[in-house]
Design a protein with these regions (language model features):
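Acidic, glycine-rich calcium-binding repeat modules characteristic of RTX/beta-roll
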Residues: 58-74, 79-83, 87-239
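Generic structural detector for well-ordered beta-strands
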Residues: 53, 210, 223, 285-287
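A generic structural signal for beta-strand entry/edge sites
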Residues: 51, 219, 269-273
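Low-complexity acidic/polar repeat-biased segments
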Residues: 1-39, 238-303
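Short, surface-exposed beta-strand/loop "edge" segments at domain boundaries and coil↔beta transitions
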Residues: 49-51, 91, 190-192, 230-233, ...
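N-terminal segments that cap or nucleate solenoid repeat domains
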Residues: 2-90
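Generic beta-strand structural signal
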Residues: 47, 84, 176, 267-268
Length: 303
């Protein structure tokens, strides 16, 4: 899909770092910063704001397949910046607004209690925002992204990714590859007055997950849970009007720290509203495509 704004770069090139942030001198550590019970299997940082890179071979398995810290890293308190190695690693943000970068390997990253930024890097990664309004970037390879609670922004990046907003009003970008956007039946919202939107001051309120770069040519699909199939839903094409148009740009969310020059600008867009036929509840919105372009797949509730 074409970008609404020429001010943005391709979503696949965006990194979840503050613009101008210097991380060239970040310390590389191989020992926990807080002593812990070895039975916990956790590599602990501190209750403060830590900025660290994990040395290779610390969280990953040794040649015998044994890891000294099988439960991964826990950042504890503070607004942390944690960068992993090329190993497959598990890292948890816990409290604070954390940034966790997996780099290489098949990583598992959890945000924790606040508003976090998770960046998978290369490898088939699992990213889970948990609480707060999180930014999740899968980047290369085939990733699974879950927003958790809060209003999250999920970007798959290159590869065939699976994006699940979970609770909250989430924005989903698959980027390159054949992606699956999962709309959970148990998080659907009651039908508003105008099929997806209540009107306030001439603007439509977005109350459901919003898929912003669905691409049928690349093989994107909508995942349905709760035993629903394409026969159990209703597709309605509508035009909606919203403010802060940069938040809904098909090229992806604005990289953190950049000046948001398109905030407060109003835009109208054609969307397909997906509702459950039996209840009328809204499962989600898809920007810029007609109902005929959408393909659906049943998805397990045990995800």
């Amino acid at each position: 899909m074409q970008s609404i704004s020429s001010e943005t770069e391709s979503v696949s090139n965006q990194l979840p770092r503050q613009v101008g942030e210097d991380i060239s001198s970040i310390p590389v550590i191989s020992q926990p910063l807080t002593p812990g019970d070895m039975k916990s299997g956790l590599f602990l940082l501190t209750e403060n704001a830590d900025t660290v890179e994990i040395a290779p071979g610390v969280l990953g398995s040794n040649p015998l397949g044994i890891s000294k810290y099988p439960n991964g890293l826990a950042a504890l308190g503070g607004d942390d910046y944690v960068r992993g190695s090329t190993d497959p690693e598990a890292m948890k943000g816990n409290q604070g607004n954390d940034t966790i970068e997996g780099q290489g390997g098949n990583d598992t990253l959890w945000g924790g209690q606040d508003s976090d930024v998770l960046y998978g890097g290369t490898g088939d990664d699992l990213l889970s925002g948990n609480l707060g309004n999180d930014y999740l970037f899968g980047d290369a390879d085939n990733d699974l992204l879950r927003g958790g609670q809060g209003d999250d922004a999920l970007v798959g990046g290159a590869g065939n990714d699976t994006l699940i907003g979970d609770l909250g009003v989430d924005r989903l970008w698959g980027s390159e590859g054949a992606d699956v956007f999962v709309l959970r039946t148990d998080t659907a919202t009651p039908p508003p007055v105008d099929c997806g939107c209540g009107n306030v001051d001439g603007l439509d309120e977005i109350t459901s997950d919003f898929i912003l770069d669905y691409n049928s040519v690349q093989g994107d699909r909508i995942g349905l849970t709760g035993g629903l199939t394409a026969n159990d839903i209703v597709l309605t094409q509508k035009t909606i009007t919203y403010g802060d148009r940069r938040d809904y740009d098909s090229s992806g969310p604005l990289p953190l720290g950049q000046i948001r020059t398109l905030d407060f600008q109003i835009e109208s867009a054609s969307v397909t509203v997906i509702t459950e036929a039996k209840t009328g509840n809204v499962l989600g919105l898809v920007k810029g495509v007609s109902p005929a372009q959408l393909q659906f797949v049943s998805f397990s509730d045990s995800i």
